[in-house]
A protein has these predicted regions:
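Short coil-to-helix leader/linker segments, especially the first N-terminal amphipathic alpha-helix
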Residues: 1-12
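Subtilisin-like serine protease catalytic core
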Residues: 13-28, 32-48, 56-107, 121-126, ...
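Pocket-edge structural micro-motifs
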Residues: 71, 187-188
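Substrate-binding/access-modulating region of protease and related hydrolase catalytic domains
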Residues: 76, 97-182, 188-193
Length: 194
Protein backbone atom coordinates (compact mmCIF):
# COMPACT_ATOMS: atom_id res chain seq x y z
CA UNK A 1 0.00 0.00 0.00
CA UNK A 2 1.31 3.42 -0.96
CA UNK A 3 0.84 6.35 1.36
CA UNK A 4 1.16 9.88 0.04
CA UNK A 5 3.85 12.19 1.35
CA UNK A 6 1.14 14.55 2.61
CA UNK A 7 -0.34 11.77 4.74
CA UNK A 8 3.08 10.60 5.95
CA UNK A 9 3.89 14.04 7.33
CA UNK A 10 0.29 14.68 8.47
CA UNK A 11 -0.22 17.66 6.16
CA UNK A 12 -3.94 16.85 6.37
CA UNK A 13 -3.91 18.44 9.85
CA UNK A 14 -2.63 21.70 8.33
CA UNK A 15 -5.13 21.40 5.47
CA UNK A 16 -8.04 20.99 7.93
CA UNK A 17 -6.99 24.28 9.53
CA UNK A 18 -6.89 26.12 6.22
CA UNK A 19 -3.14 26.01 5.56
CA UNK A 20 -3.12 25.12 1.85
CA UNK A 21 -0.37 27.38 0.53
CA UNK A 22 -2.70 30.00 -0.90
CA UNK A 23 -0.79 33.15 -1.85
CA UNK A 24 2.57 31.39 -1.56
CA UNK A 25 4.89 30.99 -4.53
CA UNK A 26 7.22 28.00 -4.58
CA UNK A 27 10.18 28.12 -6.97
CA UNK A 28 11.53 24.78 -8.18
CA UNK A 29 15.04 24.57 -9.69
CA UNK A 30 14.84 21.21 -11.44
CA UNK A 31 14.20 19.47 -14.79
CA UNK A 32 11.10 21.52 -15.61
CA UNK A 33 7.36 20.95 -15.30
CA UNK A 34 4.83 19.04 -17.38
CA UNK A 35 1.48 20.90 -17.22
CA UNK A 36 -0.32 17.98 -15.54
CA UNK A 37 -4.02 18.12 -14.59
CA UNK A 38 -3.00 18.15 -10.93
CA UNK A 39 -1.67 21.67 -11.45
CA UNK A 40 -4.98 23.02 -12.78
CA UNK A 41 -6.04 25.62 -13.53
CA UNK A 42 -2.71 26.12 -15.32
CA UNK A 43 -3.34 29.82 -15.87
CA UNK A 44 -3.19 30.51 -12.12
CA UNK A 45 -1.29 27.58 -10.60
CA UNK A 46 1.70 27.63 -13.00
CA UNK A 47 2.63 31.26 -12.43
CA UNK A 48 5.88 31.12 -14.41
CA UNK A 49 8.11 28.71 -16.33
CA UNK A 50 11.63 29.74 -17.36
CA UNK A 51 13.91 27.43 -19.34
CA UNK A 52 17.61 28.04 -18.68
CA UNK A 53 18.60 24.90 -20.65
CA UNK A 54 16.92 25.12 -24.09
CA UNK A 55 15.21 28.54 -23.85
CA UNK A 56 11.77 27.14 -24.72
CA UNK A 57 8.82 29.37 -23.90
CA UNK A 58 6.34 26.63 -22.89
CA UNK A 59 6.25 24.49 -19.77
CA UNK A 60 7.74 21.00 -20.24
CA UNK A 61 9.76 18.37 -18.39
CA UNK A 62 11.90 16.05 -20.50
CA UNK A 63 12.98 14.04 -17.44
CA UNK A 64 10.03 13.86 -15.03
CA UNK A 65 11.85 14.67 -11.79
CA UNK A 66 10.75 18.31 -11.69
CA UNK A 67 7.11 17.37 -12.24
CA UNK A 68 7.32 14.66 -9.55
CA UNK A 69 8.82 17.02 -6.96
CA UNK A 70 6.33 19.77 -7.83
CA UNK A 71 3.51 17.24 -7.42
CA UNK A 72 4.65 16.30 -3.91
CA UNK A 73 4.44 19.95 -2.91
CA UNK A 74 1.63 21.38 -5.03
CA UNK A 75 -0.65 18.67 -6.47
CA UNK A 76 -4.36 19.51 -6.31
CA UNK A 77 -5.27 15.78 -6.28
CA UNK A 78 -7.28 15.61 -9.50
CA UNK A 79 -6.84 11.82 -9.38
CA UNK A 80 -7.78 11.33 -5.72
CA UNK A 81 -6.83 12.50 -2.25
CA UNK A 82 -3.83 10.15 -2.10
CA UNK A 83 -2.12 12.56 -4.48
CA UNK A 84 -2.88 15.80 -2.64
CA UNK A 85 0.22 17.97 -2.31
CA UNK A 86 1.49 19.57 0.84
CA UNK A 87 0.54 23.06 -0.41
CA UNK A 88 -2.18 22.38 -3.02
CA UNK A 89 -3.16 26.04 -3.45
CA UNK A 90 0.37 27.38 -3.81
CA UNK A 91 1.42 28.76 -7.16
CA UNK A 92 4.28 27.23 -9.09
CA UNK A 93 7.40 28.91 -10.45
CA UNK A 94 9.32 26.28 -12.42
CA UNK A 95 12.89 27.12 -13.39
CA UNK A 96 14.38 24.48 -15.68
CA UNK A 97 18.09 24.23 -14.89
CA UNK A 98 18.61 20.50 -15.59
CA UNK A 99 18.42 18.63 -18.91
CA UNK A 100 16.65 15.40 -19.90
CA UNK A 101 19.35 13.33 -18.16
CA UNK A 102 19.06 15.31 -14.94
CA UNK A 103 22.41 16.96 -15.60
CA UNK A 104 23.17 20.64 -15.59
CA UNK A 105 25.79 23.31 -15.44
CA UNK A 106 26.39 25.73 -12.62
CA UNK A 107 25.81 28.73 -14.87
CA UNK A 108 22.17 27.69 -15.48
CA UNK A 109 21.67 27.17 -11.76
CA UNK A 110 23.12 30.61 -11.00
CA UNK A 111 20.84 32.15 -13.63
CA UNK A 112 17.89 30.51 -11.86
CA UNK A 113 18.96 31.92 -8.49
CA UNK A 114 19.42 35.37 -10.04
CA UNK A 115 15.95 35.14 -11.60
CA UNK A 116 14.44 34.35 -8.17
CA UNK A 117 16.32 37.28 -6.64
CA UNK A 118 14.95 39.63 -9.29
CA UNK A 119 11.35 38.34 -9.38
CA UNK A 120 10.57 36.92 -5.91
CA UNK A 121 8.22 39.79 -5.01
CA UNK A 122 6.28 39.66 -8.29
CA UNK A 123 5.57 35.95 -7.83
CA UNK A 124 5.30 35.96 -4.01
CA UNK A 125 8.09 33.36 -3.80
CA UNK A 126 8.60 32.31 -0.17
CA UNK A 127 10.02 28.82 -0.77
CA UNK A 128 12.86 27.69 -3.03
CA UNK A 129 13.11 23.96 -3.74
CA UNK A 130 16.59 22.95 -4.89
CA UNK A 131 16.63 19.30 -6.00
CA UNK A 132 20.23 19.35 -7.08
CA UNK A 133 23.37 17.59 -5.94
CA UNK A 134 26.77 18.01 -7.52
CA UNK A 135 30.09 16.27 -7.78
CA UNK A 136 32.67 17.24 -5.22
CA UNK A 137 34.64 20.11 -6.60
CA UNK A 138 38.04 21.50 -5.83
CA UNK A 139 37.12 24.66 -7.72
CA UNK A 140 36.76 27.03 -4.81
CA UNK A 141 35.94 29.96 -7.11
CA UNK A 142 32.85 28.10 -8.36
CA UNK A 143 31.79 27.34 -4.78
CA UNK A 144 32.32 30.96 -3.75
CA UNK A 145 30.24 32.18 -6.69
CA UNK A 146 27.44 29.78 -5.76
CA UNK A 147 27.47 30.81 -2.11
CA UNK A 148 27.42 34.49 -3.10
CA UNK A 149 24.19 33.95 -5.06
CA UNK A 150 22.60 31.84 -2.32
CA UNK A 151 23.59 34.41 0.33
CA UNK A 152 21.71 37.09 -1.60
CA UNK A 153 18.54 34.98 -1.37
CA UNK A 154 19.05 34.20 2.33
CA UNK A 155 18.80 37.89 3.09
CA UNK A 156 15.23 37.82 1.78
CA UNK A 157 14.27 35.21 4.41
CA UNK A 158 13.19 32.59 1.91
CA UNK A 159 12.75 28.99 3.04
CA UNK A 160 15.08 26.63 1.18
CA UNK A 161 14.14 22.97 0.69
CA UNK A 162 17.37 21.06 0.09
CA UNK A 163 18.31 17.43 -0.61
CA UNK A 164 20.35 15.58 1.99
CA UNK A 165 22.42 12.73 0.67
CA UNK A 166 25.47 10.84 1.76
CA UNK A 167 28.57 10.88 -0.37
CA UNK A 168 28.28 8.18 -3.00
CA UNK A 169 30.89 7.74 -5.72
CA UNK A 170 32.46 11.12 -4.86
CA UNK A 171 29.14 13.00 -5.21
CA UNK A 172 27.77 15.32 -2.59
CA UNK A 173 25.14 18.01 -2.18
CA UNK A 174 26.19 21.48 -3.27
CA UNK A 175 28.18 22.93 -0.44
CA UNK A 176 25.23 24.55 1.30
CA UNK A 177 26.34 23.79 4.84
CA UNK A 178 25.82 27.39 5.86
CA UNK A 179 22.15 27.19 4.87
CA UNK A 180 21.54 24.76 7.73
CA UNK A 181 22.15 27.70 10.07
CA UNK A 182 19.58 29.78 8.20
CA UNK A 183 16.03 29.15 7.06
CA UNK A 184 16.02 25.70 5.48
CA UNK A 185 14.33 22.33 5.41
CA UNK A 186 16.47 19.29 4.65
CA UNK A 187 14.88 16.28 2.95
CA UNK A 188 16.15 12.79 1.98
CA UNK A 189 17.33 12.59 -1.62
CA UNK A 190 19.09 10.55 -4.22
CA UNK A 191 21.62 11.79 -6.72
CA UNK A 192 20.25 13.18 -9.99
CA UNK A 193 23.06 15.59 -10.87
CA UNK A 194 26.17 14.05 -12.42
Amino acid sequence: MQISVSKQIHADFAHQHGFLGEGIGIAYLDTGLFPHKDFSPHSTRIAKFVDFVHSKSFSYDDNGHGTHITGIAASSATFGSDYLGIAPKSHIVSLKVLDASGNGVQSAFLQGLDWIHEHHRSYQIRIVNISIGSPSSEDSSASKELLKHVNALWMMVLLFVLPVETMVQNHTVFQFLVIVQKSSLLVPATIIFK
